[in-house]
């Protein structure tokens, strides 16, 4: 199978494969996506005997990792026609995608997995989970607050009302998507095209403290984005949904894993689960290590450590890299060997290095998981240089 970037002539076949594997052409999201958001220049296709049998859409995002804004491709619509499955096409598609992203100078890529195990074998690991709360609407009453007023949004130009709330919510988090006017309008446009609602809660000064994105029409009300700057804002939104008891039976909402409000829920024995949400993978080790900042307070003097990285998919990442710290928040990195050197301080697999940089897992925990090996003083040092973060992202496509 030959892989290349799509052209406009490929669009009918790209649409057909999406409709075969995901939403049908009549679906509102399909129509919105291919009318407003599809970019052939950011889509990789696999062609065999003139037939387009495999695709991945490389959605362009900027994600915030440890305070640095990194251009990133969010892989969505990873699809292979059943006629071409179980022949290694999926792995080849991912490899060619990584080669393309490396050519573009990107260091990290992300994707939302339908099955994490498929991608883990190729070096992806989960960096963001979410809480999923499900409960009968009647059970919301003890969690409500009546001090805030409600409002509804109905125009993409109202993105400016949501942006300050999102910025405040993500201020101390890691791995989230930066949203500007373009991203907000694209997002709100997709919501309104699909008949999705956006509710806000406001204080007496008219300042919006929180918002929720939700859909009606089924016994369970799904809330796919739940963002708030205060606990009373969350409770105010739950009060809003409590008023929907005649329009639904239960509610299900997602929230960041950093939120510890579950500790104060009167009855949390049921309906409280975690959802594996987003995976990440290093595209290029040198680029990733030189663009993700370190904790400068932990770097007291110049120091170099040799890190052996194992990557069974991308040979350019497999080898020993000299990581030099001490001059700034961004290290210097040089690949010193494709195989091994006499002195190796740390050995880590590509997935482990990814979640370490993303802040999802500490070096000590990676040792426990068997993804990192090294002397204890180097493990402690890594945890000072790359301290664990509260990770979050809520981009569905």
Regions found by a protein language model. Give the residues of each.
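Hydrophobic adenine-recognition pocket in adenosine-nucleotide-binding enzymes
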Residues: 6, 78-80, 226
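Conserved active-site alpha-helix within GNAT-family acetyltransferase domains
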Residues: 103-107, 113-131, 236, 258-274
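Conserved GNAT acetyl-CoA-binding A-motif
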Residues: 94, 99-113, 246-256
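Conserved acetyl-CoA pyrophosphate-binding loop and the N-cap/start of the following alpha-helix
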Residues: 84-96, 232-236
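Intrinsically disordered, low-complexity, positively biased terminal segments
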Residues: 12, 146-397
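Short hydrophobic/aromatic beta-strand element in the GNAT-like acyltransferase core
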Residues: 41-45, 55, 77, 195-200, ...
